[in-house]
Amino acid sequence: GNLLPILQSCYIRIYRFKNMKKNNLKIVKINENKSLFNYEKKVLIKELILDLKLGYFDFEKEAPQKVKFNLEINYEDKKPSSDKDIKSIVNYAKIVRLIKKLVKNKHYNFLETLAEDVFDELFKDKRIDKISLQIEKLEIMKDCSSVGIQISKKRSHDKL
């Protein structure tokens, strides 16, 4: 008794499938040049230590301070990196050079404004989707090995 409704339901589904018109089927072409994968890549820069002109208070403006940078830079790519083309990667050496150039002859009052300048510079590379940045002053407080900030900034894909 209970099996009959199930068998009838299966028969009806098979009958409908057999009698479908060809127009109901959609043919999809596969573009062989397009990758079926997205790569989520991350560049890591750990413990970049620089002497910077940094600080709000007068005593901080007397001499450069040791500052440590840690960065995680996320980007997506639709293809694997090429072993022959440096432009196919987000180059960590270039990022370090950019940060050094950015801070070379400039005084920052706050770590937060320094971070914004780093973000502005790095987000010029349109591949970069998200940056997590940690900046620490290493010698400013006797009771702490470091004090600092950590900020993450993500590119918005919304249209203005």
Where are these regions (language model features)?
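N-terminal, polar/charged subdomain of small-to-medium soluble alpha/beta proteins
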Residues: Y11-L160
